[in-house]
Regions:
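N-terminal segments that mediate ammonia production and transfer
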Residues: 1-56
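ATP-dependent adenylate-handling active sites, centered on carboxylate activation for C-N bond formation
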Residues: 1-4, 47-237
Length: 237
């Protein structure tokens, strides 16, 4: 935003700008600011060229890139842990890491003390890949107590983001307090890339592409915001 002297003001969190500027707007991802304008230097949604390979070739390409990405991030100066929900994203990341690691990886899951279906699926994956698995059990009171600090750290009132962030915040808090792990790997973005349930109802391939691009373009306001804030506020990377 701009202050009363029309100077642009930046901060790492919106709440730091309250009272300094009249209007607060996010710094657009993939941009830098120079001479009064935002200049785009990268666009994750840009399609360089359409791909017409067969499905097997495309899947193999994705597989190779995912494996290389996980393997690269296993190189860290601090101990690495893994968030495991039992869903597609985190299960794939953990399975790849388990294969590439010389010893069992440490995985963490969180769930309520009643009807914890995510814990069940995470446990099945952990047993299959042979990880050193930890379950963090939370109660209704834990969730309610976490609500206010989670809203404060996110700087958003988006219901879905807040709801998804409570569990992540609490599991990261437990990891920081109870272990010496300081780097976390987690699975994100496969739903946005490949369409959520919207894929089933998209009227055309072009409309599906448009929706996928929109979800990727807005990631910094939702899933990336959740992961970044919940992890960093607990002194993790």
């Amino acid at each position: 935003g701009r202050d009363e002297k029309c100077c642009i003001v930046f901060a790492s969190e919106p709440k730091n700008l309250v009272g300094l500027v009249d209007k607060i707007a996010p710094f657009p991802p993939g941009h830098y600011y120079k001479d009064g304008v935002f200049v785009r230097y990268a666009d994750m949604t840009r399609v360089e060229r359409p791909v017409y390979d067969d499905l097997d070739t495309i899947c193999q390409n994705i597989r190779e890139k995912l494996i290389a990405g996980v393997e690269k991030r296993l190189i860290a100066d601090a101990k690495v842990g893994f968030l495991l929900s039992g869903g597609l994203d985190s299960s794939l990341v953990c399975a790849i890491a388990a294969k590439k690691s010389p010893k069992p990886i440490r995985t963490f899951a969180i769930g309520m003390d009643t009807d914890a279906i995510d814990l069940k699926y995470a446990r099945e994956v952990a047993e299959y890949i042979g990880s050193d698995h930890t379950e963090v059990i939370i109660s209704r009171d834990d969730v309610i107590e976490a609500l206010e600090p989670v809203v404060a750290l996110l700087g958003t009132y988006d219901i879905t983001t807040i709801r998804a962030s409570i569990g992540m915040y609490l599991v990261c808090k437990a990891i920081h307090e109870q272990t010496d792990i300081r780097v976390l790997l987690t699975g994100e973005i496969s739903d946005e890339l490949f369409g959520y349930k919207y894929t089933d109802f998209a009227p055309s391939a072009q409309e599906f592409q448009h929706e996928a691009e929109k979800r990727i373009r807005e990631l910094h306001m939702y899933d990336v915001l959740r992961a970044d804030r919940c992890i960093s506020v607990n002194s993790l990377e």
